[in-house]
């Protein structure tokens, strides 16, 4: 993938003039691509009365690569505040992580709920 592409503009086609560099009236300008950062999405875990705290910590370690200490802090935030952000990702990654967590929770017969929200 090239960082720049070339745009050719032709002037005075009816009256060609000679140029020192033999460009025949063709101007070349670098087109700079305009890139924007993709919108980010929060992956949010919600508290429930049935999912064990150890299971929530396991989910945070496995699916969000948090260490034990940080996973425990996030789990306590879920428990005390009713919800907590597990990570900030692009939409595709956030949707995939939320789906994986929800699927794993169902397979483990826990009602843990994970959703995504647009950041900002």
Swiss-Prot record:
Species for this entry: Pseudomonas syringae pv. syringae (strain B728a)
NCBIfam families from the UniProt entry: PRK00033.1-2, PRK00033.1-5
Coiled coil: none
GO biological process: protein catabolic process; proteolysis
Function, as annotated: Involved in the modulation of the specificity of the ClpAP-mediated ATP-dependent protein degradation.
Top-level taxon: Bacteria
Pfam families: ClpS
Cross-referenced InterPro entries: ClpS, ClpS_core, Ribosomal_bL12_C/ClpS-like
Subunit composition and interactions: Binds to the N-terminal domain of the chaperone ClpA.
Protein name (database record): ATP-dependent Clp protease adapter protein ClpS
Protein family according to the UniProt entry: Belongs to the ClpS family.
